[in-house]
Amino acid sequence: MYRILLTKRAVKDLGKLSEDVKLRIKEKFNLLLNDPTGIGKKLSSPLIGTYRLRVGDYRVIFDIDDDKVIILRIGHRKDIYK
């Protein structure tokens, strides 16, 4: 089982979102605990992270380090890759 850690930037990103989007993202975090590579998609050009998780129009960018899933960024799909 993996542990989820959020960077300061990810906490800030999450704080800017509406409550319903936060809830949907937190529900997806539970899926990351068991198999982050199974639910996440590997990025072809990992500039800001190695994997992404799709939550509607929002994306969660993360890396995996041993037993940790490190959430790097959270944002709308039109802005997250800039």
Question: What are the functions of these language-model segments?
Answer:
Residues M1-K12, K16-L23, V55-Y58, D63-K82:
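Enriched for short, Lys/Arg-rich terminal
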Residues M1-L5, E27-L31, L43:
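Charged, low-complexity, helix/coiled-coil-prone segments
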Residues E19, L23, E27-N30, N34:
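Generic detection of well-ordered alpha-helical segments
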Residues N30-L53:
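A short, surface-exposed loop/turn module that caps and links secondary-structure elements
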